[in-house]
Amino acid sequence: MTAPDTRAPEMSRIIKLDRLPDSAMRIEASEDERRRLAGRFGLPAIYDFAATIRLEREGEAIASEGILTAWFDQACAVSGEAFANSVEEPVALRFVPAYSHADTGGEEEEIELSEDELDEVPYEGQAFDLGEAIAQSFGLAIDPYARGPEADVVREDNGLNEPESGGAFAALAALRKN
């Protein structure tokens, strides 16, 4: 079992249950928040980070739907060079009371989640952190194997495009030779 994460969120937007907005809301990360999010996700820089989200009460749960957009620099998985990248990702989350995700008393129990339960975020008290949930959605939207514009050149220069290379370990050996 892992210890709970006690770090302060890089981008917190607390939404009170008794004050849900009637219309879609736009959340934009400040320069400091973008810098901190970039550090969290191992990105050289985030230039723009925003989400437009609509919230709707469903009993004790709060459904959220919208779109997350971000423009950032990312290291190429092949060359390591930074390149400009972006995401435009739909966001659909349900904020549910934490007691609906009750602890099993320390016993690890394997459960199967339905499609509707996959994006549930538990909250405690009378508020939830929409900003942190959006930041987590961004982290999942980043392609960890993104290839920059120079990836093919680097692969060619290191002999990684040759058919006789013999798989992943041969690719590592080719990189070691250089």
Predicted regions and their residues:
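Short, intrinsically disordered, mixed-charge
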Residues: 39-43, 77-84, 140, 177
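Helix-adjacent hinge/juxtasegments
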Residues: 69-106
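Charged, alpha-helix-enriched surfaces in structured cytosolic catalytic cores
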Residues: 28, 32, 71-74, 86, ...
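Charge-rich, low-complexity linker and terminal segments
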Residues: 1-19, 24, 94-178
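A positional/architectural concept
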Residues: 1-69, 73
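A structural signal for short, well-ordered beta-strand segments
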Residues: 27, 51-53, 66-68, 87-95, ...
